[in-house]
Design a protein with these regions (language model features):
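A structural signal for short beta-strand/turn segments enriched in small hydrophobics and glycine
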Residues: 339, 373, 379-381, 419-431
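Acidic, glycine-rich catalytic/binding loops that coordinate metals and/or anionic ligands
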Residues: 325-327, 367, 374, 417-423, ...
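Zn2+-dependent peptidoglycan hydrolase active-site motif and core
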Residues: 368-418, 439-442, 446
Length: 501
């Protein structure tokens, strides 16, 4: 008999005269012995060569306008809805959290009452921000060319503080290169970008004796949780991703800077540049932000380290005719599971609503489960790490190219290992609470294409065995529809959310 208990939730343009040369790129996961060679094709990308010395650097083409600049607005009001957070309301209305709290005499920013009427203060905006493009989209995302840089060799060659840095992460001592790669791969941010920002903010890459005051906060963000290199990189990734995906989906028109300044976003920048602008908005006052995101600022550090970033632009990163390959439901035939969460954060704050959750129907809490999560398609297992398994569907071994599937909260017991080639329906492992924050045993599944997290709803909705996902706009609330059948997500197991192959 199906129970009504809560069982699972995730808490959480190039010069036309450049000749392009195709190269093959591999990541860490290679096919295991016995995998059919024909089933693991090699994917090639056309990469422009190093710029000929003295050849002109062409200005990147502006994007089409993402929005129209409107007239100045005055104060507004907002009625608090269930699930609202003051920080999210502040972000929605482009005001700082302190300014919103002060305007409403709120002492505890973590407490709101449903029905409470908030005054949204009017903050006169600064002039529109720079339209200067800093990096292409493909240099922000952990995309097809992210593996061109040997991070370990690069760090050692620079002989700075990072060359001898290590830190305990999740009970394991990791080198700086391992830490940077882990943060980059998990959040799907280009490691070159993380290294360049780290150098710009702290000098850790080239300076063997940087400011000791930055030891626990190399990006300059002070917080009890985000201390040490790994957590600081996670924090940076959140805000790089947030700027990128909110700009991609036309959810932002202004940046709110650390000093409370409001800056309208130049409507013709690209998403990669938006991510960088948003990152610096978290740390800077207005004059510093202008310096950081203009010519002569962060861009110069990036170019000194890695060359002109638009030489490696893959445009578009997502083709306009992108179609999801055929995917199965991620469990064995005849076994009942529950659809416990509609579209929600694919990875961490800042990522889009790209994930769906499923749980074995009779599981309680974080109890171990003998149910199996199965592969949704053929593909190579390229990586696993504390509850996560990454499957590369084009089989080239590079999780930044083509379609990639993330299976999250997979128990260590029976978990598939990197190098294995799975066919659709093969076993990946058991669902659990391992990895991230989870209130119950379940599977969290998400997709990436060329390293970009893909929203679970439109325009390329998740389609699992004919069940097509849609979202409501509210995190975790959504449905699956197949023909005339509709399942609504519910954080538990009830007849109306049960599903099987």
């Amino acid at each position: 008999m199906a129970s009504n208990m809560v069982i699972s939730a995730c808490e959480t343009s190039q010069p036309s005269d450049l000749v392009k040369t195709p190269v093959s790129i591999w990541a860490s996961g290679q096919p295991s012995q016995g995998a059919a060679e024909s089933s693991v094709p090699t994917l090639s990308y056309n990469i422009p060569p190093t710029r000929v010395p003295g050849s002109p650097i062409l200005t990147p083409t502006p994007d089409l306008q993402h929005y129209q600049l409107g007239p100045a607005r005055g104060p507004e009001t907002y009625i608090v809805q269930p699930g609202d957070m003051l920080s999210a309301i502040a972000q929605k209305y482009s005001v700082s959290l302190p300014a919103l709290a002060q305007a409403n005499n709120i002492v505890d920013v973590n407490t709101l009452e449903v029905g409470q009427i908030l005054t949204i203060p009017y903050v006169p905006p600064q002039p529109t921000g720079p339209a200067y493009k800093i990096i292409p989209d493909s240099e922000l995302i952990y995309g097809p060319l992210s593996t061109l840089t040997d991070v370990d060799a690069f760090i050692r060659a620079k002989a700075g503080y990072l060359a001898n840095y290590s830190q305990e992460v999740n009970g394991e001592i990791l080198t700086a290169a391992q830490i940077v790669l882990l943060a980059a791969q998990n959040s799907s941010i280009n490691p070159r970008l993380l290294l360049a920002i780290l150098e710009y903010r702290s000098g850790w890459l080239t300076n063997p004796n940087p400011d000791p005051a930055l030891d626990e906060q190399p990006f300059g963000f002070s917080d009890a949780w985000y201390h040490g290199l790994y957590r600081q990189l996670e924090w940076a990734a959140i805000h790089l991703n947030s700027g990128y995906y909110r700009w991609r989906t036309n959810l932002v028109t202004d940046w709110v800077l650390a000093d409370g300044s409001v800056v309208p976003v130049a409507p013709t920048i690209n998403a990669g540049t938006a991510g960088v602008q948003n990152f610096f908005a978290q740390l800077d006052d207005y004059s510093t932000w202008l310096r950081d995101v203009s010519p002569g600022g962060f861009f110069d550090t990036y170019q000194v380290l890695f060359g002109y970033p638009f030489d490696l632009a893959i445009e578009p990163l997502l083709p306009s005719n992108l179609i999801q390959p055929q995917l199965l439901l991620p469990f064995e035939p005849g076994v009942t599971w529950a659809f416990t969460s509609g579209p929600h954060l694919a990875w961490d704050a800042g990522s889009p609503f790209g994930a769906l959750d499923f749980a074995p129907a009779e599981t309680q809490g974080c109890d171990p489960s003998d149910a199996w999560v199965t592969a949704v398609a053929d593909g190579l297992i390229v990586r696993n790490y504390i509850g996560s398994v990454y499957q590369d569907l084009d089989g080239d071994g590079n999780e930044g190219s083509g379609w990639t599937i993330l299976y999250m909260h997979i128990a260590a017991r029976g978990r598939v290992q990197p190098g294995a080639y799975l066919h659709a329906g093969d076993r990946v492992g058991h669902p659990s609470c391992e990895g991230g924050i989870s209130s119950g045993t379940h599977l969290h599944i998400a997709r990436r294409f060329n390293g970009e997290w893909i929203s679970a709803g439109s325009p390329v909705p998740f389609n699992l065995g004919g069940w097509v996902a849609s979202g409501s706009g509210e995190e975790g609330v959504g449905s699956l529809k197949r023909n005339d059948q509709v399942l609504e997500s519910y954080n538990g197991s009830i007849p109306t959310n049960q599903i099987h192959r």
